[in-house]
Amino acid sequence: QNGEKISKSKGNGLSVEEWLNYGSPESLSLFMYTQPRRAKRLFFDVIPKTVDEYFTYLGKIAECDDASLLENPAWHIHKGTPMAIKLPVSFNLLLNLAGVCVAEDNEVMWSYVEKYAPGVTPETHPHLDKLIKYAVTFYKDRVRPNKLYRFANTEEKTYLKDLKDALSKLF
């Protein structure tokens, strides 16, 4: 990540088990599938990008003809039987949402997702439900312990009061 040697004892490395706490086994398969002969840097920021890439490939399955199916990594990861899945929100968005709404459980996340995408539920989108679980776990393990809060300074309090007054006039 920073051009330094990866070392778990330094805390800048990532094990397979840690990946599987925050991302699906299929996303790890995609990470390993791309450029298999090249050394890879395994760090936490790679997980959201790879999870989103994996679901992008799954979303393209329905549009693929037989020739382009072979070029889609999802086809190989699922041994020729991938499901075409399109998600209403990306994993990156879920991670951002988890940090903003202080997601302590899946229900908090689902309340926001259902407002954003009406009709989307854990039952209709089980893959999204798994991603929400990963996002909540990521928030609890990686974001919350490092989150620092501070009181607003005088200038910020003035701006926040002005914003509150402006919004109260709208509603």
Describe the residue ranges of each PLM region:
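Catalytic adenosine-cofactor/nucleotide-binding cores of aminoacyl-tRNA synthetases and other
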Residues: 2-140
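Basic, alpha-helical terminal appendages of large translation-related enzymes
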Residues: 115-171
